[in-house]
Amino acid sequence: MIKPRLLLLALAALALVLAACGSGSSTTPTADGGGASNTETAAAVEGGILRIGYTDPPDGINPFVGSNQVSYVIFQEMYPALVQYDEDYQLTGDWAESWTVSDDNRTYTFELRPGKWSDGTPLTSADAVWTFETVLKYKDVSTGLTAGYIDGVESVEAPNDQTFIVTYAKPKATALANLQPFYILPKHVFEQHVGEGGKGLDKWDMKAEGELVGGGPFTVKAYDEKGTTLLERNPGYYGPKPNLDAIGITVYQNPDAMVSAFKAGEIDSMDKVPVTLVDQIKAMPDVQVEEGLVPDVVNIGFNANPKKTTHRELLDPVVKNAMAHAVNRDKIIETVYNGRAAPAASILTPIAGDYLDPTIEPEAYDLALANQLLDDAGYTKGADGIRTTPAGDRMSYEVILPTDIEGQQRKFEIIQEDWKAIGIETVGKPMDGSAAWDAMMAPDGKYLEFDLHMWSWLGYIDPDFMLMTVMCDQYGNWSDTGYCNPEYDALYAQQAAEMDPAKRVAIVHEMQQILYRDHPYIFVAQSEFIRAYKGGWTGITAPYLVYVSKIPWDTIGRTAD
């Protein structure tokens, strides 16, 4: 039951955010602003609404469907996880107050904090048992997006309401890190939607439910992926009581609309400030800007499925290598990102520490070399300058362009021009993120239609998740290329089980070398994450933390006037 005062506040906030509606990781964030700000040290007062602007809409409110950054921000606020990352990016407890590990490194015993779901139902270890068992049972039917996080779990048990035990078939170095994005769901709600053979879990249209049941610091009161999602404080939350009454997340159709709303005072914070407008925002009085490089890797993805019958030349390592040498990263970074990015060459980023292979470097921009590679391989230019394959097929490809990626069109134009210079024609296909994901997997998760895409991955601190996304068993789940290599998959299993950090690092380096050789992607740049807050807020954390921790939602609050 919602308290009347909170309901009135929430409805008022919703009205404000709707009126404004038009349409990531940093290890060393910096703060800047045009006016004096005491947001770093001021004490927070209880109450109030934080109104946040985004330009990329969530792609689902159902944890078995949603996969993008905004969806995971919502999941992080709504659902318990056993562990989370702290401000130093070290694993700490979330729902778990403490845990122990058996001598054989197979069994984890978690002692849980008492709490309640937002509808008043007790949150217990039975919810964890149900979530784990259900996800594993239906991983090939409807729960594949989340099943990878608990791969290798042999059994789970709940000896009492506040104790949860997970046993793995063999030691797993990645166990705790992978439990961070694995969210515990309310059994009494989700079990009603399992359906025959588990087929209902990813078909449940949760946005039609209105108010949803959550166990985190906030829970969804109203959801609109193209407008405003309102989250209210959960009185039964097991963690520190949040300062805020509610959070409003508004999606804008473009960055200019979001910035206009910010300037007009219609929102309090902007997620992903456009790099072209950062200096303008910094010049505003009483504004705090947090910025820094994030593990967000901008990439070009090839359709790597060998069963695709058209444009099979895109499977040729020579073609992909030539195209990689025709990507002008420096120009993209300066033109599209105003210098606020760094060249990328791996699926991992520096936040992964020693796991990032330092010997891998971006392919040198060299059009002469790219042309020579294609000439030597028998790809000949026609009268119009576009090449044909030895079989006589024209080398002209469609490139899927998700429109929620900053600077996407300009980035594509730079690459398109250089690829044309080496005899490869490309046609951009702009579409929203959900449509782009469907187009890549078409038909039915088989990756038989698309040629290339330009997107990005927001990586995790432990490398396991990013390495998992290109495995054979991620067809129809996390894979966005259709890449499958049994040699790579075998190494993935080895690194996951390797408890010696140095040996695991060596395996992960070898995996990156395979991806560099096979080129399911051309990695372009590691971008900055830039977030802005109006004055009057305290408890602001590093930009990336909102994706991997509830700490930002526990600490942020409005300062006293």
Each language-model region and where it sits:
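Surface-exposed binding/hinge segments that line
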Residues: A147-E196
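Ligand-site clamp/hinge motif
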Residues: M206, N234-Q280, E413-Q416, E425-V427, ...
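Gly/Pro-rich hinge or "lid" segments in bacterial periplasmic/extracellular proteins
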Residues: D86, Q90, F182-P242, A246, ...
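N-terminal lobe/hinge region of extracytoplasmic solute-binding protein
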Residues: G53-D103, E133, V213-G215
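Aromatic- and charge-enriched surface segment that lines or borders ligand/interaction sites
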Residues: E97-V141, P159, I165, M258-A261, ...
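C-terminal motif of bacterial Sec signal peptides marking the signal peptidase cleavage site
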Residues: V17-A20
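Alpha-helical secondary-structure segments
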Residues: T124-T131, D161-T167, G216-P217, D245-A246, ...
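Detector for C-terminal structural segments
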Residues: D224, T228, P235, P295-V298, ...
